[in-house]
Amino acid sequence: MRVLIAEDEAYLNRILEKVLAKAGYAVDSCADGQEALEYLESTDAYDAAILDIMMPRVDGLTVLRRIRERGSDLPVLLLTARDAVESRVEGLDLGADDYLTKPFASQELLARLRALLRRGGAKQAAVLAVADLRLDPASRRVTRGGREVALSAREFALLEYMMRNAGMPLTRQMIEEHVWNYDYQGGSNVVDVYIRTLRGKLEIQGEKRLIHTVRNVGYVLREEA
């Protein structure tokens, strides 16, 4: 699942990115509300947004208002100061789904985010399917021919990204940027290692290969005829 973070405190922004990425989310982050609006206008692929209320240029409440004015039901979690009662009330009245006061524990952030996604607001919560492979983003459950497949958070994020783009060849750069959330440096074999592990877990009982190598490009997930 893909989450947008808008937080102007650089240190907290980096922490949020790391926490969500480690939990298996694809993350885009920005430092002000204007950037957040530009991200939101460029794609409708986000499953949730985490917005700091107090940001430069455009504040979090204005971003939230614009989201709701467009008719979007995107789940929104507001980050607020402990004494910002009026802002929290205004945010909830504008259509925020929840809020979290600073400072907060990463476990609580993740729990609140999971709760938002469970409530049905995520646009991409439908079960993904390719051949006999099933991935449920909401329950984070993967099965192959009815067999449960245990995946790490990163393996789950990789498989989800490939299933959302089934049939489309994906370069290593695309995979690293979307799943690992850092710029591609070249020379790294991290994608190849994870693909090999994922194949092993999906083909443990001799099932047909679904993740194929595309020479000089990268990988593609598709069902062979």
Set out the residue ranges of the language-model regions.
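DNA-recognition element of transcription regulators
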Residues: 105-118, 150-160, 172, 186-204, ...
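Conserved amphipathic alpha-helical interaction elements at protein-protein interfaces in regulatory
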Residues: 22, 26, 42, 69, ...
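DNA-recognition alpha helix
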Residues: 175-181
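N-terminal/domain-start alpha-helical segments
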Residues: 1-123
